[in-house]
């Protein structure tokens, strides 16, 4: 995977122990991403540092998963902490094919990420029903209309909401970490413990994240 780097074990208060995969911002992002030129968190430190380093890196994803298995007790991989699944505004088939093959070869490792270009990914033939059970790619959407379209295509989605008390659809759950922070209390879980975004048992549950003043969360930003 060109323009891609990985950290087999990273740990912070929100995510808990996870492996992170970084891609170059811009060239791997869809031109339709509304945050690309205004507020993309991946252009801010410290994520920007990893994204810049990824420019010169090539990641062997299967070998990376072997390293994750050895070093990461959670065996959870978060894709696209920076960047997306594109190259020059087209679906990066080399990336997707290697990702899917590696996921199938390592069913004990949970892999998840978000894309701002689910329609192009879907049109390219990479639909949710073609992903193995341990791989979840969520549609990152910016409004309820796009969320409805993603759901109609069979995609699990993540969207943002300004108010954690706002009414959500029956198949939506507010991120418990964001909800706790909105109430001014310490979250009682981490992403690694929660698993709402990626565990197979939650495959029909869509996620709502908190709108952040000065810029929206992107892809469930940590």
Regions inferred by a protein language model and the residue ranges of each:
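Class I S-adenosyl-L-methionine
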Residues: 1-222
């Amino acid at each position: 995977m060109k323009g891609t780097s990985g950290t087999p074990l990273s740990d912070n208060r929100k995510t808990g122990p996870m492996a992170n995969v970084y891609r170059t911002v811009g060239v791997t992002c869809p031109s339709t991403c509304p945050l690309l030129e205004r507020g993309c968190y991946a252009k801010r430190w410290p994520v920007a540092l990893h994204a810049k380093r990824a420019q010169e890196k090539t990641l062997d994803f299967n070998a990376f998963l072997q390293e994750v298995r050895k070093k990461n007790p959670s065996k959870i991989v978060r894709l696209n902490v920076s960047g997306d699944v594109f190259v020059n505004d087209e679906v990066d088939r080399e990336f997707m094919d290697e990702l899917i093959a590696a996921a199938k070869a390592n069913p004990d490792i949970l892999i998840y990420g978000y894309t701002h270009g689910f329609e192009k990914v879907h049109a390219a033939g990479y639909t949710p029903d073609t992903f193995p059970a341990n791989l979840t790619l969520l549609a990152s959407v910016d409004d309820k209309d796009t969320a409805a379209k993603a759901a109609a295509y069979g995609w699990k989605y993540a969207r943002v909401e300004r108010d954690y008390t706002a009414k959500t659809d029956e198949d939506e759950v507010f991120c418990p970490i964001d909800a706790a922070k909105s109430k001014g209390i310490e979250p009682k879980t981490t992403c690694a413990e929660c698993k709402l975004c990626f565990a197979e048992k939650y495959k029909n549950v869509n996620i709502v994240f908190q709108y952040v003043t000065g810029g929206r969360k992107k892809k469930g930003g940590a």
